[in-house]
């Protein structure tokens, strides 16, 4: 008997330990991790991050946001660098998107926000209302009003929905949950130019794509795009719960005293993990290596799977990769697990690969070999 709600479809396996890019179950079986806990443990199970959190455990764990926090300032500086932003820390991606929605509406005095079909921004009410998937929203009664949904990568569809009451657009650089669908470069350029012309704020949801996943600190750096607001989570704490919302400094007036807040957001344990994570991630060599390994993974998957009739396409950016197939991908996930490889699905028919950024070429080759045999 379980004491838990049955809202997850749990596999009959429990991981109890880990070693860098490998997971270990309670029977001591070892698995190669191509999931990173759904894009969370981007640096694997990293001893430098462990040590940073351990050191903080020996100091203060939590203090409310009524007092100064030098570690919040330090992590914010690493996230922002020379960019013109301010930071707000929270506990998750959905909370970061809630903050972004509130900031956009308050700063502009407008209520409409354009999102995209097949998007995913979270499961709390505002973020859920911005999600363009009926299976996520339809069971819970009326959603938050003011959201419109354009076709992803279709500029005319987006433009047709704008009005004098449009506060912002919220967009994922790569639609992860719907099948690893990257944004088109021309579309992003057109969207950026139009929004700047019409004073429409651009909110970029980097919850899954950020913190080095695509070979850049932020995935929008691959495009001609200048976001007004950026949301982050997942890989930021490398396994500890943390989210962040970055907003342009000229929006700072809208988030003054009492406008928004959180009890646990910016707590020192999660910030200790984020601080060390960013110290490692903000390394040009590491990010270049992610791009190189991502190219290696995509090219070799394409070569290995070229004659597989049930493979439609291999796509992705950096180490965020999707294999679109004609059959149910959950069957591949089960067989991969049996052979010692942990992978994910996305959308209806996509195998999603999110290996740690620290994965080795040898481990990538092993994963490709297993996938080729199964598919």
Swiss-Prot record:
Main location: cytoplasm
Keyword tags: Amino-acid biosynthesis, Aminotransferase, Arginine biosynthesis, Cytoplasm, Pyridoxal phosphate, Transferase
Subcellular location: Cytoplasm
GO cellular component: cytoplasm
Residues with the N6-(pyridoxal phosphate)lysine modification: 234
UniProt binding sites for pyridoxal 5'-phosphate: 93-94, 120, 205-208, 263
Record Pfam families: Aminotran_3
Cofactor note: Binds 1 pyridoxal phosphate per subunit.
The reaction(s) this protein catalyses: N(2)-acetyl-L-ornithine + 2-oxoglutarate = N-acetyl-L-glutamate 5-semialdehyde + L-glutamate
UniProt EC number: 2.6.1.11
Cofactor requirement: pyridoxal 5'-phosphate
Pathway stated in the Swiss-Prot or TrEMBL entry: Amino-acid biosynthesis; L-arginine biosynthesis; N(2)-acetyl-L-ornithine from L-glutamate: step 4/4
Residues that coordinate or bind N(2)-acetyl-L-ornithine: 123, 262
UniProt-listed GO biological process terms: L-arginine biosynthetic process
Something else known: May also have succinyldiaminopimelate aminotransferase activity, thus carrying out the corresponding step in lysine biosynthesis.
NCBIfam families assigned to the protein according to its UniProt record, in alphabetical order: argD (TIGR00707), PRK01278.1 (NF002325), PRK02936.1 (NF002797), PRK04260.1 (NF003273)
Family per similarity comment: Belongs to the class-III pyridoxal-phosphate-dependent aminotransferase family. ArgD subfamily.
Protein name per UniProt: Acetylornithine aminotransferase
Native organism: Staphylococcus epidermidis (strain ATCC 35984 / DSM 28319 / BCRC 17069 / CCUG 31568 / BM 3577 / RP62A)
Lineage, highest ranks first: Bacteria, Bacillati, Bacillota, Bacilli, Bacillales
